[in-house]
Regions:
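Nuclease and nuclease-like effector domains acting on nucleic acids or nucleotide cofactors
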Residues: 1-72, 78-141
Length: 141
């Protein structure tokens, strides 16, 4: 059973895909007017190989890293350019590749015909998430 909205559930293709998001504890929210399944366990203080914290990375528009030093992926649920996004650890995204991606249909997201400037959108997502984290820290949450 899914606790996610109809918008998210309509894009999820299988129980296995739903379980990927649920097992990661992803929480539905909105970032920059887009529905997102957020990983609330991102550690803002984790430091990358260049000495930057995750919060500093995100402020620059870079994806945060997980405990293995790998950057998070923003996965388009349903593989449409306007799909809800899921913040997934790199290892989770790779391990569940066949569950998360329908290889029988072309993706709208990263293809040459995509009208979306994905690099810019991804960067704006992480900047907005940095602002959320700073606001929570200021509240003492």
């Amino acid at each position: 059973k899914s606790n996610y909205s109809n918008e998210v559930n309509e894009k999820i293709r299988s129980v296995e895909e739903l379980e990927v998001y649920q097992n990661e504890g992803l929480v539905e929210s909105t970032v920059n007017d887009r529905t997102v399944l957020k990983d609330t366990s991102i550690n803002p203080d984790l430091i990358d190989e260049k000495g930057r914290t995750n919060l500093e990375r995100m402020e620059k528009g870079l994806a945060p890293i997980d405990e293995n030093g790998k950057p998070y992926n923003l996965h388009h649920i349903g593989q449409n350019a306007d799909s809800p996004l899921a913040e997934l650890k790199d290892g989770v995204h790779k391990k569940n590749d066949a569950i998360l991606h329908d290889k029988s249909k072309p993706t709208e997201v990263h293809g040459e015909n995509s009208s979306v400037n994905w690099d810019k959108e991804r960067s704006e997502h992480w900047k907005a998430r940095a602002e959320e984290i700073k606001a929570q820290q200021n509240k003492g949450v």
